[in-house]
């Protein structure tokens, strides 16, 4: 009797090896995310009568601050992986092997979206102040591109065989090579493809935010800032659930895979951001109601 075994398997982290330089999937996906995000954000800026060139102007600082924030956040909470003999890593450039601090080896994986959001927000606030742009409106323009970039970027985890969930035998199970498995699960071959769960969830959020963006000027319900707060709520809701499946969490007071005796950092931050989003929408609605009352009075 023939039994077909279906599962997902990464082809590896390398997209193209040209000999003198290696192009990895993670870096390629980040680049694709940036280009698509640039296109989408310019379209949305034009729809809000904001100079689309502002998107091009902020892009370099936004990329740098987001990547630095995401990497710093991860390294701080996983310092044991980057200290001592792991402080440096090898990098191939023009047929030569050079040593660089592991902190800068972003293409090897190890970034945290919450750190990227913090770094990016700092850059956005500074830019809006310097250009005298409404902060809430500008963030609403950028948010759809950010969540779409998160959806695309999650596939970098797939190619790197990282950020997967606990063992499973579901039809869409993900095969993980033994060298990438946690010690606790060496005897298991198949795991939850949490990268796929989050990628699809983020894609749904992107579609919902674009629909709301197109209705924002037609109703007072979706005031400037609504999209940003809804992003915090929806992304945090999905991330909290998905994080509970992962075997490589950043922990406070505990150790992976389950943060025994501690708490998963991403879940803690998700609760905070979810609550912040709810409070933000509450005050937006309160301000809208007060404005209507003053107008009617």
From Swiss-Prot:
The residues that cross the membrane are 20-40, 57-77, 105-125, 133-153, 193-213, 225-245, 266-286
Reading the lineage from the top rank, the first entry is Bacteria
GO molecular function terms noted in the UniProt entry: phosphatidylglycerol-prolipoprotein diacylglyceryl transferase activity
Q: Name one GO cellular component term.
A: plasma membrane
| Sorted UniProt keywords | Cell inner membrane, Cell membrane, Membrane, Transferase, Transmembrane, Transmembrane helix
User: Might you name a Gene Ontology BP term for this protein?
Assistant: lipoprotein biosynthetic process
Q: Does the keyword Cell inner membrane apply?
A: yes
EC nos: 2.5.1.145
Q: Which Pfam families match?
A: LGT (PF01790)
Instruction: Give the pathway listed in the UniProt entry for this protein.
Output: Protein modification; lipoprotein biosynthesis (diacylglyceryl transfer)
This protein's membrane topology, according to the annotation, is: Multi-pass membrane protein
Enumerate the subcellular locations listed in this protein's record, separating them with semicolons.
Answer: Cell inner membrane
Which residues are listed for a 1,2-diacyl-sn-glycero-3-phospho-(1'-sn-glycerol) binding in this entry?
154
Function summary:
Catalyzes the transfer of the diacylglyceryl group from phosphatidylglycerol to the sulfhydryl group of the N-terminal cysteine of a prolipoprotein, the first step in the formation of mature lipoproteins.
Q: Would you tell me the protein name for this molecule?
A: Phosphatidylglycerol--prolipoprotein diacylglyceryl transferase
